[in-house]
Amino acid sequence: MLPTSVSRSLYLKTFRSHLLRAPQIVLKRMSSSIDISKINSWNKEFQSDLTHQLATTVLKNYNADDALLNKTRLQKQDNRVFNTVVSTDSTPVTNQKSSGRCWLFAATNQLRLNVLSELNLKEFELSQAYLFFYDKLEKANYFLDQIVSSADQDIDSRLVQYLLAAPTEDGGQYSMFLNLVKKYGLIPKDLYGDLPYSTTASRKWNSLLTTKLREFAETLRTALKERSADDSIIVTLREQMQREIFRLMSLFMDIPPVQPNEQFTWEYVDKDKKIHTIKSTPLEFASKYAKLDPSTPVSLINDPRHPYGKLIKIDRLGNVLGGDAVIYLNVDNETLSKLVVKRLQNNKAVFFGSHTPKFMDKTTGVMDIELWNYPAIGYNLRQQKASRIRYHESLMTHAMLITGCHVDETSKLPLRYRVENSWGKDSGKDGLYVMTQKYFEEYCFQIVVDINELPKELASKFTSGKEEPIVLPIWDPMGALAK
């Protein structure tokens, strides 16, 4: 029977106190410190196991990746025959070097196929550095905007701490690429190439820029807390900060030689050794020669944590103020695979995001989840894809390009894919990799296709205006490619 009147208050206080202590009591019962005596017991047990003895002898004397590589499996999967490929060879092999610009390389490598075909070129690259310059400038400003919009949150909140952790990392998403191209266009790499200590090795530059942005964040948050700080003061501060950011950037990189609407002149020699001259603006070059219509690409992901057929938005992730948000449509793996085949059949390469370098042999250029014989040493992996994402074991880390696949005649699904990476010709086989279907299902997360390549029921998810997206926080693994 519950206590009444006078004793009820005392009872409730006692009950609440018990609830507060209960978790600590339970945790204490479940805690387990290392028992030294068990260490000897475990060691005797393992040393009596001949398989363990063999494994430890090998692993203490040889590199684990070399020792456990299943060469029989490797030979079987290293098949470079593909019955569905894009018709234009993508040359030369690109190299992002010591930078996190994979998304810019994958996206520009996709579009350069159109330029190669349109202008009858043997080799061509779009300027990744041109986009990189403006991405840094825009990201810095985007960061300042996020600091202002989160000023009501405590400095120790997860959001503010996440923002401060890496204000202008090199990474990005395809929608962020589109934001840049819509505003700044594209130019040939001949007009604006990489620099050895900024674009190709960005760590120091990022460090100095990050330090200055954190200083600016404190200034803005302090000003916003003062009652006297009206909107005009904040705007003035931000303009001063934008100027200083641009000054810092100009120390590390040349200012792009042409404005988005300014005409440039580019001379080139085609496959037939004929000389041509093009006069174009960056914005015109993107549409006329790279054939990019920014309104058509859409992103699809496979994230088994969430229902399929639903839109997923990554909150606060972006680079250009007023640009498009990062939004995906979540679908099953079979749908992703079929869309890849359809796009390749339309002679278009596929931008995709994966967890790299999981189960990737960089020497031979093979991506396969059974490439290393971990079960031979008793190391068995049991987590499913959804659990790996939830427990931070798997996330989207790298963007590459699918330029071909081998389709099974019976299932009409790919058996393997031809992947173009951006780590130079010494990675893989001349820069190319083979990715198995099982790898695609387990470690591929995103593909980009044109909306007109989708079935009507999927395309309508993007166009109907009736779909309310699932909103994930900026630190979610599905946004990790932008780190």
From Swiss-Prot:
The N-terminus of isoform Cytoplasmic is blocked. Keywords: Cytoplasm, DNA-binding, Hydrolase, Mitochondrion, Protease, Thiol protease, Transit peptide. One of its GO terms (cellular component) is mitochondrion. Its main location: mitochondrion. PROSITE patterns: THIOL_PROTEASE_CYS, THIOL_PROTEASE_HIS. It comes from the Eukaryota. CDD domains: Peptidase_C1B. The keyword Isomerase does not apply. The active site is at residues 102, 398, 421. Its EC number is 3.4.22.40. GO terms for biological process: homocysteine catabolic process; proteolysis; response to toxic substance. Inhibited by E64, a specific inhibitor of cysteine proteases, N-ethylmaleimide, iodacetamide, and mercury and zinc ions. It holds the Pfam family Peptidase_C1_2. GO terms for molecular function: cysteine-type aminopeptidase activity; cysteine-type endopeptidase activity; DNA binding. It catalyses: Inactivates bleomycin B2 (a cytotoxic glycometallopeptide) by hydrolysis of a carboxyamide bond of beta-aminoalanine, but also shows general aminopeptidase activity. The specificity varies somewhat with source, but amino acid arylamides of Met, Leu and Ala are preferred. Residues 483 form a propeptide. Belongs to the peptidase C1 family. The normal physiological role of the enzyme is unknown, but it is not essential for the viability of yeast cells. Has aminopeptidase activity, shortening substrate peptides sequentially by 1 amino acid. Has bleomycin hydrolase activity, which can protect the cell from the toxic effects of bleomycin. Has homocysteine-thiolactonase activity, protecting the cell against homocysteine toxicity. Acts as a repressor in the GAL4 regulatory system, but this does not require either the peptidase or nucleic acid-binding activities. This is Cysteine proteinase 1, mitochondrial.
